[in-house]
Amino acid sequence: MKPFYPLAPALLLTHVLCAQTTAEKLAEYMDATYKAKLFNGVVLAARNDSILLAKGYGWRDYENRIPHDTNSIFRIGSVTKPFTAVVILYLQEHGQLKLTDKVSKYFPEYKYGGNITIKNLLTHTSGIIEYSNQDNFFEELAYKPYTQKDFWKYIKNEPLDFEPNSEYSYSNSNYFILGYLIEKITGKPYEQYVREIIFNKAGMTHSGFDFKNLQSSYKTVGYDVFHDSVHIRSRIADSSAAYAAGGIYTTAGDMFRFHKALIENRIISQKSQQEAYTNYKEGYGYGWYIREWPKGKLIGHKGGIMGFCTLFTRGVSDNSCIITFSNDYSCSDNPETDLNAIDVPFLQILEGTYTIYYIPRVAIKSNPASLPQYTGTYKMDSTIGFTIDVTVKDNHLQAIFNNGNPYAFYEEKKDFFFTKQSNSQLEFERDASGKIIDVLLYFNRRKVPHLKIK
């Protein structure tokens, strides 16, 4: 269950999109991302009631060649936390608890409960240790039923990491206790109550908890690694081992229905939502990470659970929504494949604040014998004297700009090269005889010619 992290850099390349609609821009970005083999999963982007893009990319089940579509069912890991927080706020609205209540009111046997409030649990400011840190959790315990007794046995005598409310530290244990609290107050299993209060009200008919025993042709296979030549299936963790911190499975369409139900105040009031979307410590509210963006506040959560990664982002001011599911658990290990590499450009496109956005490029295998023809020194056709020195290194071009740091450039097509180190490209031009005479440097919307001088 991975938390939501700050924005990650992506392998990006400038591309002007003057005449396209927002939906077309989103689709083109995703088509290029998939072509570059940087994503396998499902994406949905919407604003208000309008779904602008909803599409599957790659394989739901690689071995059996079953492709993704918008019906694919994914585990969402820590994106479960907003659901748990919404139920807690629902109970507060109905007078069944107060966020100022001490944990000891409900669990008097927990010796630290007298210093910890429900609000501390919601905001990860309790100081309670991470339950999954116990020995053999990811090797053994996560794959079999994990009970409340198991949880308290480990937690009850472990000291707090810090004085409650003095610091922030993300801990799934907080949301386990919130789940147990929901059960104690309602007299119903957590899963049943979430279904009644959220799934049913929002119309989320393809969502649930027990993914291991789910019988559906739309059930997605999770992979620890999903690369060109390596596809390693994940073991399916028991939903009870993720519980109220990360146990939900769902579809992109159902997540959009959850988003709409919140916008329309069908589950909790606008007042409760405003409280939930407040930054209490370190950019975290009640089950939501909070970000400031040029056109207003963003709320969301990131989730990861064996075989699956999820990113759920919502724009408070424009009712936008971006849902990204991947069944490649390793995607967050690389900034090029991290789900933020989709989320950030999508936000830019939805806002319309940029006339450009960025598309990943795909390198072809260069012919080593052809690369030396591009080497040489190229000079800007001006009095500035800016130079580019091009050499060959490790079967790609290396360019040094004005005697600075070297940049590796990879061939996309004949005479056109790109770098992964910046938003720059080189396009070599030839004369009538086929001899290379100059190079065009593409950088920050500019196209700057450089003549070959040696």
Indicate where each model-derived feature is located.
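Catalytic loop of the DD-peptidase/beta-lactamase superfamily, centered on the K-T-G motif
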Residues: Q20-K55, T186, Q192-R195, N200, ...
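Non-catalytic beta-strand/loop surface segments
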Residues: I177, Q215-T220, D224
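Conserved residues at the C-terminal ends of beta-strands
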Residues: H124, D210, Y442
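Alpha-helical scaffold elements that line and support the substrate/ligand-binding pocket
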Residues: V43-L52, R75-K98, K102, L121, ...
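Active-site-proximal loop and beta-strand segments within enzyme catalytic domains
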Residues: E28, F39, W59-N172, K188, ...
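Bacterial Sec-dependent N-terminal signal peptides
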Residues: M1-A23
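Short, solvent-exposed turn/loop segments enriched in Gly/Ser/Thr/Pro and often Arg
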Residues: R47, E109-Y110, D210-S217
